[in-house]
Each structure stands twice: as C-alpha cells, then as structure tokens.
C-alpha cells in the first residue's frame, strides 16, 4: 500500500512539474480555475437539490460544456499573448511577461466561479462572512478594469 501511495505522489509531482514547465506563469491560475470549476459544479448540483430543482444529465452536460468553454477563453488569451509576443519579437521588443492576457482571463473566470460558489453556498444555507461576496465582486471589477484600454488625457 505504501508503494502505491509513493508511486501516486511521484506521478502527481511529475504531472505538476510537466504542467508547470508547459504553462509557466499560467500554471497557478489554471490550477485554481479548474479547482473552482469542479467546486462550482458540485455546489451547483447540491444547491439545485436544495432549491428543489430537477437536475438531469442534459443540464449537467451543459454545465460541463460551459466549463470547457471557459477554459477555451484562457486559450484565446494565450493565443493573443503569443501573437503579441511574436509581433514584439519581430521588431526587437522583448515583453517582460508572457501570458498576461491569459492570466487576466483566468483570474476573471476564477472570480466568476467564486461568486457562483458563494451564491450556491448561500442557497444551500451556509452562512458566509458578509464581506466575502462583495470582496470577490470587487476583485472581479478590478480585473475587468485591468483589461480595459486606458484613456489618455
């Protein structure tokens, strides 16, 4: 049994190292995003039960497809980052950070997921600290502002 646990830990560490080397700065946001996706999906199912709503495999599949589409938004951000880096490299500019747009997209998605998780918890009957939901909403707003063009003046 101890051998299997050790093998599992080694495999998990190797997977983490591989993903970290592949994603770089995106590793932590993507990991958090996927964790939030799973938690939101589970709390959403439980909250639907508490609200007396019928949950079907079709509704569940739609939720999963939505989560996968959210992952694709990060891919779109990464593609934009890669294009910008390629264009900058072409003219001799070295951007200090790669995957900036993708990181902002991932943080925005994480904020949306956290809002949904907290709302699901409220529907389940969990008492949450009164400052938590407004704080997450503020972080989401700040993330949205980070992606907006700055006005010169």
What is the predicted role of each segment?
Residues 51-74:
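Juxtamembrane helix-capping/reentrant segments at transmembrane boundaries
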């Amino acid at each position: 049994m101890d051998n299997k646990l050790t093998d599992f830990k080694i495999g998990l560490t190797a997977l983490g190292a591989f993903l970290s080397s592949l994603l770089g700065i995106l590793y932590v946001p993507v990991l958090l995003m996927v964790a939030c996706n799973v938690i939101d999906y589970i709390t959403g199912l439980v909250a639907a039960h508490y609200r007396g709503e019928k949950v079907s495999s079709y509704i569940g599949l739609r939720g999963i497809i939505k989560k996968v589409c959210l992952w694709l938004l990060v891919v779109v951000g990464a593609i934009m980052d890669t294009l910008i880096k390629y264009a900058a490299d072409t003219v001799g500019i070295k951007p200090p950070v790669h995957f900036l747009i993708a990181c902002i997209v991932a943080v925005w998605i994480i904020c949306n997921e956290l809002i949904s998780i907290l709302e699901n918890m409220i529907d389940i009957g969990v008492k949450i600290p009164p400052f938590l939901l407004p704080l997450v909403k503020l972080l989401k707003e700040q993330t949205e502002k980070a992606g907006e063009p700055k006005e010169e003046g």
